[in-house]
């Protein structure tokens, strides 16, 4: 079961592959088309496993940590697929049939972060017209993914640390605490250790989040995977545009 913070449930479409190779167009006979079999991925598991040394190392670390319940800090540049890695860790874990809740920490104003993370009860503040479950309660039994965790305010970091230490949350306006059984995955494109040294990120929270660290390689480190990625995106483009482009010329 995969859900994002907006409670969208992703279904699993039937994967398709490109099996054949043909010239790019009828008029281009100078170079044969170059084609690599498109990887089988789904919306539920969009991870593309490459053949480059960097990709193999990434897969090795994912397979190593996924069966455990350790917190994982996923580091990498923007656009390298940190959430995709988090989803794969979840799908390879014992929690695979439980919720996966992805939270963009950078998109949550600090004033409402407590409500977003821990929920609230009706009438607890102006605008609280109904009870609301927070992301932690929604992820109960499963995995919560805290994307761009370095963007949280210092106050919100304190609240998050307490929830992670005690595995209990208290919705705003409630007198009762709720026990939560969750695995925490976090991601950042920042150097959190540098942020700790500057006093912008709590050291105790940093150590709580990085029981295991995975660094997602950049595309420049995965040059051997380029044709695999190209084949995947070509297949998606064919599907969306209703075309039947079969491959790439050697020049391309």
Which residues make up each language-model segment?
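Conserved ASCE P-loop NTPase core motifs with emphasis on AAA+ ATPases
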Residues: 1-54, 60
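AAA+ ATPase active-site-proximal loops
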Residues: 33-179, 184-190, 195, 219, ...
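Short, solvent-exposed beta-strand edge segments and adjacent coil->beta transition regions
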Residues: 43-45, 211-214
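ABC-type ATPase nucleotide-binding domain
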Residues: 87, 208, 212
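Charged helix-capping and loop-helix junction motifs
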Residues: 198-201
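Conserved AAA+ ATPase "SRH/arginine-finger" region at the nucleotide-binding site
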Residues: 213-225
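Conserved Sensor-2/SRH helix of P-loop NTPases
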Residues: 225-230, 234
């Amino acid at each position: 079961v995969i859900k994002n913070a907006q409670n969208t449930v992703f279904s699993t479409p039937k994967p398709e592959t490109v099996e054949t190779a043909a010239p790019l167009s009828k008029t281009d006979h100078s170079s044969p088309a170059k084609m690599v079999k498109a990887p089988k991925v789904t919306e539920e598991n969009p991870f593309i496993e490459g053949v480059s040394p960097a990709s193999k190392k990434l897969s090795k670390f994912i397979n190593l940590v996924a069966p455990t319940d350790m917190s994982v800090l996923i580091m990498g540049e923007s656009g390298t697929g940190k959430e995709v890695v988090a989803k794969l860790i979840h799908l390879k874990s014992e929690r695979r049939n439980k919720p996966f809740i992805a939270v963009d920490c950078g998109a949550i104003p600090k004033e409402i972060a407590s409500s977003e993370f821990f929920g609230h009860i009706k009438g607890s503040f102006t605008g609280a017209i109904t009870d609301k479950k927070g992301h932690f309660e929604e992820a109960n039994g499963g995995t919560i993914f805290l994307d761009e965790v370095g963007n949280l305010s210092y106050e919100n970091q304190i609240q998050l640390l307490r929830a992670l230490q005690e595995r209990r949350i208290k919705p705003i306006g409630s007198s009762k605490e709720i026990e939560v059984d969750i695995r925490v995955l976090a991601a950042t494109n920042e150097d959190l250790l540098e942020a700790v040294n500057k006093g912008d990120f709590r050291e105790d929270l940093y150590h709580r989040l990085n029981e295991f660290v995975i660094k997602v390689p950049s595309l420049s480190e995965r040059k051997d995977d380029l044709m695999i990625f190209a084949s995947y995106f070509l297949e998606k483009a064919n599907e969306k545009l209703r075309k039947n482009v079969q491959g790439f010329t050697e020049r391309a």
